[in-house]
A protein has these predicted regions:
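Compositionally biased terminal segments of proteins
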Residues: 1-178
Length: 178
């Protein structure tokens, strides 16, 4: 479990050192709970680090080795299975939060995270994250959330029941409908 930005940064720094020792250069694009911790000072607990890994596949051995060596990491602590769930639209507003020999780490933009959290709609944690991201983006109307989602996903992919739940939640927090 990761509970602080410092924990994740230390772990990613170690990953970079191990990659560099093998002559590897890897880029991570972090999404999900880890992105909320790293980029948006959201106090949260996340079990893994969801990331798009480029090039894919080259770090599996290093990730497994770290889990075994440390003993406090699950084998899937760096989760690349999230890749098929990411928007196809490039995230032009992502930003580099860490660059060490062997590793460059970008965090998803608030817009992309908002769209991903809204699409996932998995319950209270995602609702809270959507609200935090609305504050960061200074959104005043629920319609702005759906505009961002449509722009990121290319079409409305938010399930109607999730859209209704998010709308109700955000309106209860002071966002207008229009």
């Amino acid at each position: 479990m990761f509970t602080t930005k410092d924990e994740i940064v230390a772990l990613l720094t170690e990953l970079g050192e191990r990659l560099d020792a093998r002559g590897l250069e890897v880029e991570l694009y972090i999404v999900g709970g880890a992105a909320m911790l790293l980029g948006y000072d959201r106090s949260a607990v996340t079990r893994d680090i969801d990331a798009l890994i480029t090039p894919s596949g080259v770090i599996d051995e290093v990730v497994d080795e770290m889990a075994k060596d440390r003993g406090d990491l699950p084998p899937d602590w760096l989760n690349s299975r999230v890749a098929p769930l990411l928007p196809r639209l490039a995230d032009s507003r992502s930003w580099e939060m860490l660059s060490v020999a062997g590793l460059s780490v970008e965090v998803a933009s608030a817009e992309h995270l908002l769209a991903m959290k809204a699409r996932a709609g998995r319950g209270p944690r995602d609702l809270q994250d959507v609200a935090v991201l609305c504050e960061i983006l200074e959104l005043r109307a629920v319609s702005q959330v759906w505009e961002i989602c449509d722009r990121v996903w290319g079409e409305s992919v938010i399930r109607p029941e999730v859209r209704a739940t998010i709308t109700e939640f955000l309106e209860s927090r002071g966002l207008s409908q229009a």
